[in-house]
Design a protein with these regions (language model features):
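Catalytic core of nucleotide-sugar-dependent glycosyltransferases
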Residues: 1-190
Length: 190
């Protein structure tokens, strides 16, 4: 299953929503898509009855989802994301490869890390690694989703990073130790 969620702040045009929908359909993979009520510049996505009928056996649409629970589910094989920092870390910890589509702020850098740094997925960007300004076609989306969902290299890499993040978080790990050190420094300064 491909989990699709573009965060709480990204807005997408109606034409782009249609291209995403058709790209997901053409990929052939089952998907769970969080379609926020205001994600189309204040409007809700309005999918055609024909589209909904064609994908009804392998698509599920919700306006909110418990992201950590979904990413932790064993049936989730990929995450189509805006590449926000929290979503990126949650996916890595859960061991889920990502297809990043950055919009603004930290997202272009995060998506560059996803694809080029950590090699735990792919991203959609222009030649300068800037967010895309133009319409992305269903064919590009289909191709990227297929590559994400069928390539073992992303799953292998994200599993390595997931294990590292878990080790860092447990007692004696680097993140755990840094957190405890931070708490102690706060206690010593009234």
């Amino acid at each position: 299953v491909l989990y699709v969620s573009f965060g709480s702040l990204a807005f997408v045009s109606g034409q782009q929503i249609e291209e995403i929908a058709l790209g997901l359909e053409d990929s052939g993979f089952p998907f769970l898509w969080v379609t926020r009520p205001n994600m189309m510049y204040g409007q809700s996505p309005n999918f055609s009855i024909d589209f909904l009928e064609r994908v009804k056996e392998r698509a599920y649409f919700v306006d909110w989802a418990p992201q950590l629970d979904i990413l932790a589910h064993t049936s989730v094989g990929g995450f189509f994301t805006h590449g926000g920092w929290n979503s990126t870390l949650e996916a890595i910890t859960a061991g889920v490869p990502m297809l990043g589509w950055p919009y603004f702020s930290d997202q272009p850098v995060d998506c560059k890390c996803i694809e080029q740094g950590w090699k735990v997925g792919l991203s959609l960007h222009d030649d300068d690694n800037a967010p895309l300004k133009s319409l992305v076609s269903r064919n590009v989306i289909k191709t990227k989703v297929e590559e994400l969902m069928t390539s073992n290299k992303f799953q292998d890499k994200v599993n390595e990073w997931s294990l590292s993040s878990i080790k860092a978080s447990i007692k004696g790990g680097s993140s755990s130790n840094n957190f405890l050190s931070f708490v102690e420094s706060l206690k010593s300064h009234p």
